[in-house]
């Protein structure tokens, strides 16, 4: 099975601390890298993780609060210094172009590569990117400004060819792609061979959902139903529930409740408030509702 892993580059929130970096993650799927959010200092974290800059083609920004996007100017500049030539695609909600275009014009106008900016409607659940390896869907979140989560779903073959059966029926190689996609096969004498006799079920696609920043938002549950791993912000503990509501963030308990309702296989919490020196309390609070919870930490890698 191809690699599908999530690297945590930063899991802190807006206030800088000595414990955590601002939000950023990298998904490694079939030798391609996809970044989600780009907090300050992300280049250093990228090197710590021994990730290859050239394998990154797409960056997905959740919203335009600084702890999620202030790393973009430096990261984009670094790619230019490294001699990048391939286009970099930056996806984000309304305002991403107003934020990034003046910076590119002022500081990055002589770079050896292009940056393409793609604006996402944060109010809609939609397919926002597709390539040979993955489909990426937007997840409408509820925050103080437009915010969007992302659902990554790997692309798998719908069916696996039973080569012994294909050879038995003398099926031409040219017919294999259609059979793998689910078609029956008609022999030269007109006999129909059902697809189920020629294939076996495909591997279910692995799915990863990133939901930050957001207040408690049950409307996302149908979108993320059954995901293999859910990252959900857990900025506060329940004892600070009033502050969570005031700032449109979630508590660890609320993050766990979303995971429970969605039937997620595992929950990864992060985006910790700087008021907590130790995240153990957040982890225990989440685990009291949803046992398979992991507390994110820098340089952590989670395999799906």
Swiss-Prot record:
Binding site for Zn(2+) 2: 67-68, 213, 271
CDD domains to which the protein is assigned, alphabetical: RNaseZ_ZiPD-like_MBL-fold
Active site positions: 67 (proton acceptor)
Enzyme class, first EC level, given as a word: hydrolase
Keywords from the UniProt entry: Endonuclease, Hydrolase, Metal-binding, Nuclease, tRNA processing, Zinc
Signal peptide span: none
Enzyme Commission code: 3.1.26.11
Binding residues for Zn(2+) 1: 63, 65, 143, 213
InterPro entries: Metallo-B-lactamas (IPR001279), RibonucZ/Hydroxyglut_hydro (IPR036866), RNase_Z/BN (IPR013471)
Reaction(s) catalysed (UniProt annotation): Endonucleolytic cleavage of RNA, removing extra 3' nucleotides from tRNA precursor, generating 3' termini of tRNAs. A 3'-hydroxy group is left at the tRNA terminus and a 5'-phosphoryl group is left at the trailer molecule
Claim: Metal-binding is one of the keywords in the record: yes
MF (Gene Ontology): 3'-tRNA processing endoribonuclease activity; zinc ion binding
Cofactor: Zn(2+)
Coiled-coil stretches: none
Co-factor binding details: Binds 2 Zn(2+) ions.
Domain of life: Bacteria
NCBIfam families (alphabetical): PRK00055.1-3 (NF000801), RNase_Z (TIGR02651)
Function: Zinc phosphodiesterase, which displays some tRNA 3'-processing endonuclease activity. Probably involved in tRNA maturation, by removing a 3'-trailer from precursor tRNA.
Similarity annotation: Belongs to the RNase Z family.
UniProt subunit comment: Homodimer.
Alphabetized PANTHER family for the sequence: ZINC PHOSPHODIESTERASE ELAC PROTEIN 1 (PTHR46018:SF2)
Name the UniProt record assigns to this protein: Ribonuclease Z
Species the sequence originates in: Porphyromonas gingivalis (strain ATCC 33277 / DSM 20709 / CIP 103683 / JCM 12257 / NCTC 11834 / 2561)
């Amino acid at each position: 099975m191809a690699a599908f892993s999530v690297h945590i580059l930063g899991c802190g929130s807006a206030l800088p601390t000595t414990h955590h970096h601002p939000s950023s993650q990298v998904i490694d799927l079939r030798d391609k890298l996809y970044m989600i959010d780009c907090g300050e200092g992300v280049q250093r974290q990228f090197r710590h993780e021994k990730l290859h800059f050239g394998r990154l083609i797409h960056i997905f920004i959740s919203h335009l609060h600084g702890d999620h996007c202030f790393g973009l100017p430096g990261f984009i500049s670094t790619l230019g210094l490294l001699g990048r030539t391939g286009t970099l695609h930056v996806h984000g909600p309304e305002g991403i172009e107003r934020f990034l275009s003046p910076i590119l014009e002022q500081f990055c106008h002589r770079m050896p590569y292009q940056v393409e900016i793609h604006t996402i409607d944060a109010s809609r659940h939609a397919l926002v990117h597709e390539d040979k390896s993955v489909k990426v869907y937007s997840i409408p979140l509820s925050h103080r400004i437009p915010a969007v989560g992302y659902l990554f779903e790997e692309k798998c073959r719908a069916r696996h060819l039973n080569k012994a059966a294909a050879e038995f029926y003398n099926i031409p190689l040219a017919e294999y792609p259609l059979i793998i996609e689910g078609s029956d096969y008609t022999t030269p004498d007109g006999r129909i061979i059902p697809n189920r006799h020629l294939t076996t079920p495909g591997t279910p696609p692995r799915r990863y959902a990133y939901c930050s920043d957001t207040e408690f938002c049950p409307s996302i549950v149908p979108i993320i139903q059954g995901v293999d791993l859910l990252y959900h912000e857990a900025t506060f503990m329940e004892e600070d529930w009033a502050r969570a509501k005031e700032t449109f963030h979630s508590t660890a308990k609320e993050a766990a409740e979303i995971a429970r309702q969605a039937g997620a296989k595992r929950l990864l919490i992060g985006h910790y408030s700087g008021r907590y020196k130790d995240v153990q309390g957040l982890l225990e609070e989440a685990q009291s509702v949803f046992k398979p919870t992991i507390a994110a930490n820098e340089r952590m890698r989670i395999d799906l």
